[in-house]
Amino acid sequence: MEAQKLSVEAIEKGTVIDHIPAGRGLTILRQFKLLHYGNAVTVGFNLPSKTQGSKDIIKIKGVCLDDKAADRLALFAPEAVVNTIDNFKVVQKRHLTLPDEIAEVFRCPNPNCAGHGEPVKSRFYVKKHNGQTRLKCHYCEKTYNRDSVAEA
Protein backbone atom coordinates (compact mmCIF):
# COMPACT_ATOMS: atom_id res chain seq x y z
CA MET A 1 0.00 0.00 0.00
CA GLU A 2 1.34 3.42 -0.96
CA ALA A 3 1.89 6.01 1.80
CA GLN A 4 -0.65 8.83 1.87
CA LYS A 5 0.76 12.12 0.60
CA LEU A 6 -0.43 15.55 1.77
CA SER A 7 -1.65 17.89 -0.99
CA VAL A 8 -0.67 20.93 1.10
CA GLU A 9 2.48 20.93 3.26
CA ALA A 10 2.10 20.40 7.03
CA ILE A 11 2.84 23.26 9.46
CA GLU A 12 4.57 22.99 12.82
CA LYS A 13 2.48 25.60 14.66
CA GLY A 14 -0.50 27.68 13.57
CA THR A 15 -4.02 27.29 12.19
CA VAL A 16 -5.52 25.10 9.50
CA ILE A 17 -8.94 26.03 8.12
CA ASP A 18 -10.17 22.82 6.52
CA HIS A 19 -13.31 21.74 4.66
CA ILE A 20 -13.87 25.18 3.09
CA PRO A 21 -16.36 24.82 0.22
CA ALA A 22 -14.44 24.75 -3.07
CA GLY A 23 -14.03 28.26 -4.45
CA ARG A 24 -14.49 30.07 -1.12
CA GLY A 25 -10.85 29.98 0.03
CA LEU A 26 -9.91 33.19 -1.77
CA THR A 27 -12.93 35.01 -0.32
CA ILE A 28 -11.89 33.97 3.18
CA LEU A 29 -8.29 35.09 2.58
CA ARG A 30 -9.57 38.49 1.46
CA GLN A 31 -12.33 39.01 4.04
CA PHE A 32 -10.21 38.03 7.01
CA LYS A 33 -7.01 39.65 5.73
CA LEU A 34 -5.11 36.43 6.40
CA LEU A 35 -2.20 37.59 4.25
CA HIS A 36 -1.62 40.64 6.49
CA TYR A 37 -0.20 38.65 9.41
CA GLY A 38 3.21 38.53 7.70
CA ASN A 39 3.37 34.78 8.25
CA ALA A 40 3.55 31.98 5.70
CA VAL A 41 0.12 31.11 4.30
CA THR A 42 -0.40 27.96 2.25
CA VAL A 43 -3.61 27.55 0.27
CA GLY A 44 -5.03 24.58 -1.57
CA PHE A 45 -7.90 25.01 -4.02
CA ASN A 46 -10.27 22.31 -5.28
CA LEU A 47 -8.57 19.51 -3.37
CA PRO A 48 -10.27 16.10 -3.27
CA SER A 49 -12.60 15.58 -0.31
CA LYS A 50 -14.41 12.38 0.69
CA THR A 51 -17.36 14.30 2.16
CA GLN A 52 -17.59 17.35 -0.13
CA GLY A 53 -16.24 16.11 -3.44
CA SER A 54 -13.75 18.99 -3.50
CA LYS A 55 -12.66 21.57 -0.93
CA ASP A 56 -10.30 24.45 -0.25
CA ILE A 57 -7.86 24.55 2.68
CA ILE A 58 -5.87 27.39 4.27
CA LYS A 59 -2.84 26.91 6.54
CA ILE A 60 -1.45 29.90 8.46
CA LYS A 61 1.91 29.37 10.09
CA GLY A 62 2.40 30.84 13.57
CA VAL A 63 -1.12 32.29 13.95
CA CYS A 64 -3.90 30.90 16.15
CA LEU A 65 -7.43 32.19 15.54
CA ASP A 66 -9.53 32.90 18.61
CA ASP A 67 -13.09 31.57 18.96
CA LYS A 68 -14.66 34.87 17.85
CA ALA A 69 -12.65 34.96 14.61
CA ALA A 70 -13.33 31.28 13.98
CA ASP A 71 -17.08 31.76 14.37
CA ARG A 72 -17.02 34.71 11.92
CA LEU A 73 -15.69 32.25 9.36
CA ALA A 74 -19.02 30.44 9.62
CA LEU A 75 -20.58 33.25 7.58
CA PHE A 76 -18.58 32.05 4.56
CA ALA A 77 -17.91 28.41 5.33
CA PRO A 78 -20.34 26.99 7.91
CA GLU A 79 -19.04 23.46 7.39
CA ALA A 80 -15.37 24.42 7.81
CA VAL A 81 -13.27 23.12 10.67
CA VAL A 82 -10.59 25.26 12.35
CA ASN A 83 -7.68 23.20 13.64
CA THR A 84 -5.04 24.61 15.98
CA ILE A 85 -1.68 22.98 15.30
CA ASP A 86 1.27 22.60 17.68
CA ASN A 87 4.34 20.47 16.97
CA PHE A 88 2.71 19.24 13.73
CA LYS A 89 -0.28 17.82 15.65
CA VAL A 90 -3.91 18.97 15.95
CA VAL A 91 -4.33 20.16 19.55
CA GLN A 92 -7.79 21.70 19.10
CA LYS A 93 -10.51 21.11 16.52
CA ARG A 94 -13.38 23.62 16.30
CA HIS A 95 -16.53 23.04 14.31
CA LEU A 96 -18.01 26.41 13.41
CA THR A 97 -21.36 27.88 14.41
CA LEU A 98 -23.00 30.99 13.05
CA PRO A 99 -22.77 33.86 15.54
CA ASP A 100 -26.04 35.61 16.51
CA GLU A 101 -24.43 38.99 15.96
CA ILE A 102 -21.34 40.32 14.20
CA ALA A 103 -19.76 43.72 14.83
CA GLU A 104 -16.95 45.80 13.34
CA VAL A 105 -16.39 43.48 10.39
CA PHE A 106 -18.61 44.69 7.55
CA ARG A 107 -20.03 48.01 6.45
CA CYS A 108 -23.74 48.35 5.74
CA PRO A 109 -24.41 48.52 1.97
CA ASN A 110 -27.20 51.09 2.53
CA PRO A 111 -25.70 54.53 1.71
CA ASN A 112 -28.36 56.20 3.91
CA CYS A 113 -27.56 54.07 6.96
CA ALA A 114 -26.57 55.93 10.15
CA GLY A 115 -23.55 53.65 10.35
CA HIS A 116 -21.90 55.45 7.42
CA GLY A 117 -21.40 59.02 8.58
CA GLU A 118 -21.47 58.53 12.34
CA PRO A 119 -18.71 57.36 14.68
CA VAL A 120 -20.47 54.07 15.44
CA LYS A 121 -19.30 50.50 15.00
CA SER A 122 -21.07 48.40 12.40
CA ARG A 123 -23.35 45.75 13.82
CA PHE A 124 -25.43 43.05 12.15
CA TYR A 125 -27.76 40.33 13.40
CA VAL A 126 -27.15 37.00 11.68
CA LYS A 127 -30.02 34.76 10.57
CA LYS A 128 -30.39 31.68 8.38
CA HIS A 129 -33.31 31.97 5.95
CA ASN A 130 -34.14 29.31 3.34
CA GLY A 131 -30.59 27.96 3.58
CA GLN A 132 -28.98 31.38 3.05
CA THR A 133 -27.11 33.48 5.57
CA ARG A 134 -28.77 36.89 5.98
CA LEU A 135 -27.50 39.90 7.92
CA LYS A 136 -29.77 42.60 9.37
CA CYS A 137 -28.20 45.99 10.08
CA HIS A 138 -28.67 47.17 13.66
CA TYR A 139 -29.06 50.82 12.57
CA CYS A 140 -31.16 50.91 9.38
CA GLU A 141 -32.80 47.49 10.02
CA LYS A 142 -32.44 46.44 6.38
CA THR A 143 -31.62 42.80 5.70
CA TYR A 144 -29.00 41.74 3.17
CA ASN A 145 -27.56 38.49 1.91
CA ARG A 146 -24.04 37.71 3.04
CA ASP A 147 -22.39 38.53 -0.28
CA SER A 148 -23.98 42.00 -0.50
CA VAL A 149 -22.59 42.94 2.90
CA ALA A 150 -19.19 41.37 2.25
CA GLU A 151 -18.74 43.40 -0.94
CA ALA A 152 -19.88 46.75 0.54
From Swiss-Prot:
Its cofactor is Zn(2+). Zn(2+) binds at C108, C113, C137, C140. Keywords: Metal-binding, Pyrimidine biosynthesis, Zinc. GO terms for molecular function: metal ion binding. One of its GO terms (cellular component) is aspartate carbamoyltransferase complex. GO terms for biological process: 'de novo' pyrimidine nucleobase biosynthetic process; pyrimidine nucleotide biosynthetic process. It comes from the Bacteria. Pfam families: PyrI (PF01948), PyrI_C (PF02748). Belongs to the PyrI family. PANTHER family: ASPARTATE CARBAMOYLTRANSFERASE REGULATORY CHAIN (PTHR35805:SF1). HAMAP family: Asp_carb_tr_reg. NCBIfam families: ATCase_reg (TIGR00240). This is Aspartate carbamoyltransferase regulatory chain. It comes from Neisseria gonorrhoeae (strain ATCC 700825 / FA 1090).
